[in-house]
Amino acid sequence: MFSYPANDEDTYLSWYKDSFSSVFVATNPFIKIPDFPLNSQGEWMPDEVNTIAKQRGVETGVTCREISELCGFSSIAHVNRALRLTGSKRIVNDLACSSDTEKMLGVCKDQHLFVPDEGYYSPLVQIALARFLKQLGHDEVIVADQFGTSPRQMRSEEFLLPEDFVPPEIYTLDKSAYLSIYTDYHYFLVCQSERSISVANPMDYFEGFFADENTNDLWGVGSLGDNLNGN
């Protein structure tokens, strides 16, 4: 079936060209719940925070664009680069920027913001996913764990349940849409056929940008000097 690109250098549109006409790079929002203590750096977001965020909804979300402005960054690409030194920190030094990470974490501490977990859909994204799939007319989808393991069917409305976990890989039964978040990353890919995107445009549901012919997993790491994505 479908899979996430094998290498960072593989461009999204080329990788999926035989199945999809567009790829949208979507970001996970940060979460603001003032009445719950922040987790320590490197720890997963508490389950209780995920549950509360799903219950309270969009009011708990802070977009990467807003984080970029709070940090004084020039684009959300800098937010992505800063996030890569949280969690597992599986990134080579040349592609990271510790000063940006420190600045972002300082802002999150001052603003009482929970940093999104790598490799998982934010609770607010899970709500948006349910709306997105409903608009596409898919009451049931196939979900799978990382690398496409353990595929099974799941009802889209279950994405809304506070206690439910949405696996990292999702594709529709008619194979017109595929979504995936890689284990080390904080953003996810929304791949669609022309007909699918004519019914539900991901820009109406998620923060992010459409990939061009050069976009790959290096869009938000490294020097960022010539990168026009994630502006």
Residue ranges and their predicted role:
Residues I33, V62, F159-L161, I197-A200, ...:
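Generic alpha-helical propensity signal that fires on short helical segments
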Residues P5, W15, I52, Q126-A128, ...:
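Sparse, context-dependent recognition of short Cys/His-centered cofactor- or disulfide-binding micro-motifs
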Residues M1-E157:
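Extended, low-hydrophobicity segments enriched in charged/polar residues
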Residues L179-N231:
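Alpha-helical oligomerization segments
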Residues Y4, Y12, Y16, Y120-Y121, ...:
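Sequence-level detector for tyrosine residue identity
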Residues C108-K109, G119, R155, F159, ...:
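Alpha-helical context
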Residues D139-S196:
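Amphipathic protein-protein interaction modules
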